[in-house]
Each structure stands twice: as C-alpha cells, then as structure tokens.
A protein has these predicted regions:
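Multi-pass alpha-helical membrane architecture of UbiA-family
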Residues: 3-27, 31-351
Length: 351
C-alpha cells in the first residue's frame, strides 16, 4: 500500500509465520517421510512468531514494533536502494547523507509500517485464525489506538516523502489508497486471485525503485527512467511468485474467510509450481534485457543467480507448506542480489 506502503500488502514478503501443532498432527501418512522437515519448519516459525501474550507483559515500544512488523520493511528499502544505485548519481558517501536517511525512514518504519498497520486493521478477523498473536487479534492494541497510529504514520509518511521530493509525496498518497483497495471491503483485492499479488508486487518493487531513482536524479524524464521501469517490472513478475509462497502459511484461514489465493484456488503443489515459474521467468527476462543493453557480464551474473533458486524449488514443490520458510530464507537472497546486479548494470549503461 502506501507508496512504500506497497509494502503493506507486502506485508507478507520475505519471512512468514506460524503453523500450529494441530496442522502437523493432521498430516496424512503419506507425508510422514517429511516429518523431520516439518519439525524444522515448525521450529523456525515459532522463533519468528511470538505467542499470544497479554499487553501487560509488553512495553508500548515493543507493541508498536510488533505492529509495524520490521521484517517486512527490508524488501522495500532494498528496492529504494536499487533505484538510487541505478540513477548513476548514488555513491558510497551518499550512505551517510540526509536524503538516504530519509529514504530509509520512509520506505521502512513509516510507509511500510503504515501498510502493515492498515493490513492488520482490515485483516483482524483473518488474523484471528492465521496469526492470533498479532497485536489487534491478540487484544494488545485497540481499534481506536490502531486508527490513531495509522493516521499519524500516514501524515508523517507524506511529510517525509515531500522532503525527499514532492513527487514521492504523491506516491505515498497513492500508496495509502492502494492499501485500502488491497485490504478493505468491498473491493479487497487480496480476495481476487492474481489481483492482490500483482498490486503488491508492483507497489513492492516498481514504485520504491523509481522513487529511489527520482530521489537522486537531478533531472529525469520518462525516457531516462525507462531501463529502471523495465527491470523493476520484470522483477515484479518474480515478486508475484514470491507473494504466492507467502500465501502457504495462511491457506486454512484464507479458505474459511473466502480469500482466493493461488494455493486455495489451485492447490498447494500446483501453486508452488506456478510460483517457481514466475520467479524464474522474471529474472531470466531481466537478464535478457541486460543483454539488449549490452551489459553481458551483468546479464550472465543475474542468470547464474537463478540456478540455486531453481534447485531449492524442487523441495518447495514437494512440500510447500513445510518448505516455504526455508525457501524464502535462502532463495530470496539470490533474487535480491540479482536486483542489485541489475541496478549496477543500468548505472553502467548510463555511464
């Protein structure tokens, strides 16, 4: 949602949470051969998904951090960084600059945090099934306080976006609208199969990437932004597959509430195959585009980075619900590395 709120929907992106012992006990006999993998996956989920606790045991700062869900900020911050690098005007000294600090503040705790809060607010019924430890369904943050926090964070996001560039402030406003379209009834795009994943992926990648480039480009036109638009759009294809992997953790709740994700619509294994194809095609097409730009070495590196992901996808397809956390924890590193390689290629092409 919000510009980088896109992150919002993205809420689920890199790391996923919780599968209960109930679901593990329901595994059929033909899945017992994967018992050790299931146990490992469960342990990982327990580590990253705190149990439901009463508010008296948590400080207000801890509650706020859980509500903002910091783990979801990373992909959006990374997209902003890739956009900055691709501008050709971003160098090592800029890491210490005020503009970069504001960019990280915006794409991380502010815009992405706003998205997370919006998503939690509108998904509170679903979270009672899938993620009961989240602050709202857990009773740790009231709806009134959540509304106040969302309003304050939205205003701060627009303000910081404007300080970076007026156009970025507009992106933030559009992102806030997108967040509502994604999560709120009656539209609730996340219920509409492909629509939810696509809008999240676009917001997740294209908008922050272009915002990063705009932030550091002294002058820009649609033509100058075109290489970044193409690469970011192609990685959006891959990100759509990533969104599908994040859906495996909430299949039961989605099915009960009527959220039509790919795993719900096509089955978990078929959805895993679709996700793998999208992830690979997007990156290979990006490598092909770099070849068109004459950046052959960068294209080769991007293509090689797909190989370990392809290998890990065999385990994912075999057991999507137990291997999703492991896949994201390992394979995503190669995908985001490919994004940075593409950004460096665009910078090289411009220079």
């Amino acid at each position: 949602m919000p510009f980088f709120s896109f992150t919002c929907y993205f809420c689920n992106t890199i790391i996923t949470a919780g599968v209960s012992d109930f679901f593990l006990r329901k595994r059929s006999a033909d899945r017992r051969e994967y018992g050790r993998q299931q146990e490992t996956s469960l342990n990982v989920r327990k580590l990253i998904s705190p149990g439901k606790r009463s508010a008296e045991h948590l400080s207000k700062i801890t509650l706020l951090i859980r509500f903002l869900k910091p783990v979801t900020w990373i992909p959006v911050i990374w997209s902003f960084l890739c956009g900055a690098v691709s501008s050709g005007a971003f160098g090592w000294p800029d890491f210490l600059g005020i503009k970069f600090f504001l960019g990280i503040l915006l794409t991380g705790p502010l815009a992405s945090g706003t998205c997370q809060m919006l998503n939690d607010y509108f998904d509170r019924d679903l979270d009672e099934i899938n993620e009961p430890w989240r602050p709202i369904p857990g009773g740790e943050i009231s709806l009134r306080n959540a509304t106040i926090l969302i309003a304050v964070w939205s205003l701060l996001s627009v303000l910081v976006g404007y300080l970076i560039h007026p156009l970025i402030a507009l992106y933030v406003i559009i992102g806030i609208v997108n967040a509502h379209l994604y999560s709120a009834n009656p539209i609730k795009l996340k219920k509409r199969l492909w629509a939810g994943n696509i809008i999240v992926a676009l917001s997740y990648l294209v908008i922050p990437w272009i915002a990063g480039e705009i932030a550091y480009s002294s002058g820009f036109t649609l033509q100058s932004l075109f290489p970044s638009l193409v690469v970011a759009a192609l990685f959006t294809v891959s990100s759509t597959g990533t969104m599908t992997i994040n859906d495996f953790k909430s299949v039961e709740g989605d099915r009960q509430i009527g959220v039509k994700t790919l795993p719900v619509a096509f089955g978990e294994r078929n959805a895993a195959v679709i996700a793998a194809v999208l992830i690979n095609i997007g990156q290979l097409m990006a490598a092909g585009y770099l070849l068109m730009l004459g950046e052959n070495l960068f294209a080769l590196i991007v293509a090689l980075l797909v190989i370990p992901q392809f290998y890990l996808q065999f385990d994912l397809v075999r057991s999507p619900k137990t291997m999703d956390v492991r896949y994201n924890a390992i394979a995503q590193n190669f995908l985001v590395a490919g994004m940075l390689v593409c950004a460096l290629a665009i910078k090289s092409y411009r220079l």
